[in-house]
Regions:
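Structural/interface elements that position substrates and couple domains in central-metabolism enzymes
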Residues: 1-240
C-alpha cells in the first residue's frame, strides 16, 4: 500500500473543490475512503463527497492485451456518493465499450479482490489434484480432460502456482482485517506458493539421473502474450 499512500500524498495539495480523484490500484476494502480520502482531507480540509468527488474503479486488464481489455471489459465503479460514481461513469464511457456498473467504494474494492481470489482458489484446486493423482499413480491431465467433459465442470490445468504481482497478493487483502484462520483462501495460497518448490524438486530428481546434466528451464505465466514471470531462479538454485 506504500505506493497508494505515496501517490495520495503527492496529489493531496493539488486537489481543489470540484475535482475528481479515482483510484484503480487493487486495494483492501476501505482504502479509498479511509486512506486516500483522509490524506486529502487532512491536507486540504476538503471533504470527499461534499467538496470533491472520490471513486474507485478496479483495473481489469491482461498484460499483453492492455489496450484491448481497457476498452472492451465491463467496469465496476464505486463512489463515495452517487454523484462521484456518476461523474466517474461519464469519464469511463468516453473509452470503455463494455458495460459500467455503479456501486459503493468498498463493494468495488472487494469485487476486484474476489475476482483474483477466485482464480487463485481454482488454480490451487488443479494443483492439489495433481499432487493427489501423483500419490495414486494417475495421470492428472487425463483426469481433468475427462472431468471437463461434464457440461458444468471446467477444471484448470495444474502448473507452477501463481505468477504476477496481483493474484498472489490479493487474497491476503481479503483476510487481513477479518481475523479468520485456516480458511480455504489461506490454504489455496499455501498450495500455490509451494508449487514452484515441488516442481523444482521433481526436476532435480530427473536431472540427477543423468551425468553432467545441462538444464535451461523457464516457466512463463503468460506465454501467449510474451509476458514472462520467471521461476528460473528457484529451479536453477535447486538443481545446482
Amino acid at each position: 500500500m506504500s505506493y497508494v499512500i505515496s501517490a495520495a500524498n503527492k496529489i493531496r495539495d493539488k486537489i481543489e473543490k470540484g475535482n475528481l480523484v479515482i483510484l484503480e490500484s487493487t486495494s483492501p476494502p476501505g482504502t479509498t475512503r479511509n486512506i486516500v480520502g483522509k490524506i486529502i482531507t487532512s491536507s486540504t480540509g476538503l471533504l470527499a463527497g461534499k467538496d470533491y468527488y472520490l471513486a474507485f474503479c478496479p483495473e481489469r486488464v491482461l498484460p499483453g492485451k492492455i489496450v484491448y481489455e481497457l476498452e472492451s471489459n465491463d467496469r465496476i465503479v464505486g463512489g463515495i456518493d452517487k454523484k462521484s460514481a456518476e461523474i466517474t461513469e461519464d469519464i469511463y464511457k468516453t473509452f470503455v465499450k463494455g458495460k459500467i456498473f455503479l456501486t459503493d467504494l468498498e463493494t468495488s474494492e472487494f469485487v476486484k479482490l474476489t475476482e483474483n481470489t477466485y482464480r487463485d482458489i481454482n488454480i490451487a484446486f488443479a494443483n492439489e489434484l495433481s499432487l493427489i493423482c501423483r500419490d495414486y499413480g494417475i495421470d492428472v491431465r487425463e483426469v481433468i480432460k475427462y472431468a471437463n467433459m461434464h457440461p458444468r465442470v471446467n477444471i484448470l490445468n495444474p502448473g507452477p502456482g501463481v505468477g504476477g504481482h496481483c493474484i498472489a497478493v490479493d487474497p491476503w487483502f481479503i483476510l487481513e482485517n477479518t481475523g479468520r484462520k485456516d480458511t480455504l483462501i489461506e490454504k489455496s495460497r499455501n498450495i500455490n506458493n509451494n508449487m514452484p518448490f515441488i516442481i523444482s524438486e521433481r526436476v532435480t530428481e530427473i536431472v540427477n539421473k543423468y551425468k553432467e546434466p545441462r538444464v535451461e528451464f523457464v516457466v512463463s505465466s503468460k506465454p501467449r502474450f510474451n509476458v514472462a514471470n520467471f521461476y528460473l531462479f528457484i529451479i536453477s538454485r535447486k538443481c545446482s
